[in-house]
Amino acid sequence: MGKIIGIDLGTTNSCVAVLEGDEPKVIQNPEGARTTPSVVAFKNGETQVGEVAKRQAITNPNTIQSIKREMGTDYKVDVDGKNYTPQEISAMILQNLKSTAESYLGDKVDKAVITVPAYFNDAERQATKDAGKIAGLEVERIINEPTAAALAYGLDKTEQDEKVLVFDLGGGTFDVSILELGDGVFEVLSTAGDNKLGGDDFDQVIIDYLVEEFKKENGIDLSQDKMALQRLKDAAEKAKKDLSGVSQTQISLPFISAGESGPLHLEITLTRSKFEELSDELVRRTMGPTRQALSDAGLSSNDIDEVILVGGSTRIPAVQEAVKKEVGKEPNKSVNPDEVVAMGAAIQGGVISGDVKDVVLLDVTPLSLGIEIMGGRMNTLIERNTTIPTSKSQVYSTAADNQPAVDIHVLQGERPMASDNKTLGRFSLTDIPPAPRGVPQIEVTFDIDKNGIVNVTAKDLGTNKEQNITIESSSALSDDEIDRMVKDAEQNAEEDKKRREESDLRNEADSLVFQVDKTLKDLGDNVSEDDKKQAEDKKEALKSALEGQDLEDIKTKKEELEKVVQELSMKVYQQAQQGDAAGSNQSDVEDAEYTEVKDDDDKKDNK
């Protein structure tokens, strides 16, 4: 069985890991970094992913960031008249990580475990699975990020029983999970969170502050200038990171705008205390789900043995202090918050492939599931924090005499009224035989699989007629759409590969032309005019080919010039050897004369 890679598909950054022996290993990307920015850019028909896409975000409006926040919605990204779904953009990031893993392993990779925030609903999980499929990956398991982190933390601690609180504050989402670890069993007791809270929001409060200060001073609203906003975003992110280590940082953005008197510059000193004041509301928002998770698990903060911080945003000192104050324990800093989730996913891949033994993962569903009943109320079948996979059935009846069909409105959420919860889907059970109200017996069954994805079945117990659906939200993709996107992704990957090969070939050819010029200059009179002319002719032929689009011609001309350069180098090398040999012989003669003179002197001394 091939390797199953572990992928942390993050809002801001993503990470890929693989199990090597008993240890998960984070794979470096081609730039040598252990995480890859979750950024996709479209430029001149080419798709760019990661650091290269992030670097040109200021000047390229076709740059997409934080797409994870739109997963499970019907949001579309318009790029030069073509619409892309969040699944397609995420697939491009996954494809990049897949390629990184393949380069490292030297083998094809087609299976993965992908992590999602624990608080992701059904639509968001399904969208993540679809993204994997578009990227050419068979998603063996979708697991929750805090659970993955606990796996990585607790793999070598299976002898002792521990209750662990995982506090996961990423770029765009926030989760708290409480797990019990012991004897190789990782059981999630509860989970809570906020899918619209993360590092991006901490950046935003700095951006808002900078915009406000600049407007006060210069009367210009930078939030209306797209390019200025991107520069502010980059500066805010950097300032946030700086303030995790220092008490103040200088934000300097020259030529950010222009006024009547000329160019305007933004120069502001941001202190950690000011940042803490700006972000206080965000930090306090993380405490609600933390208390909720403890309450749902039936635990107090005194029952927690370890606190694990996950996600880059947990490096913010105010966040660490708030967690410490709430739980009453110093957070464990033995895990890397940016990498631990991918490492846990790789371990889960090892569990699935059989490489990791004696580890059992018991996860939970983050939100309650039920259907709408009379009066617009929600009737819950599966409570939140129920261990998955699970199945639950309940019998309902008709609301009117001779009712021929029932509509099943599937809901996810905690509110008593159906309209206040998220609709996962609707379907109908038809052809119910005429009968008085309350007589027909309709059994509704909810199934949640190991990925947290929901199937619902409705069955008329009188006729045994059955209707079922795998929940698909308005954002879900049909098999045909996924197949089309898979083909597009493969085609784009092939085209990108060709573009890269062309770029590499042209760069190598340019470099060779420069090298030939330098070599001929260095050799000077050591090369015959005929050899020089031949090299010059081949060089000009290659330069001419580079102006065209025929790659085969460039390749041929490059090889011809390389051959001439090799022959030149050989001749020069041989000449150098001959020169050394001649010099060596001359040296021997001089030594002999010296010896003879020495003998004469000796004779004189003897006289």
Swiss-Prot record:
Gene Ontology MF terms: ATP binding; ATP-dependent protein folding chaperone; unfolded protein binding
Triggers of expression: By stress conditions e.g. heat shock.
Keywords: ATP-binding, Chaperone, Nucleotide-binding, Phosphoprotein, Stress response
Superkingdom of this protein's organism: Bacteria
UniProt biased composition (Basic and acidic residues): 490-509, 524-542, 595-607
CDD domains named in the record: ASKHA_NBD_HSP70_DnaK-like (cd10234)
Residues recorded as bearing Phosphothreonine in the entry: 173
Region: Disordered, residue numbers: 490-510, 524-555, 574-607
InterPro entries in alphabetical order: ATPase_NBD, Chaperone_DnaK, Heat_shock_70_CS, HSP70_C_sf, HSP70_peptide-bd_sf, Hsp_70_fam
UniProt xrefs under Pfam families: HSP70 (PF00012)
Regions of compositional bias (Polar residues) in chain numbering: 574-587
Record function comment: Acts as a chaperone.
NCBIfam families per UniProt: PRK00290.1 (NF001413), prok_dnaK (TIGR02350)
Family, similarity comment: Belongs to the heat shock protein 70 family.
Protein name in the entry: Chaperone protein DnaK
Annotated gene: dnaK
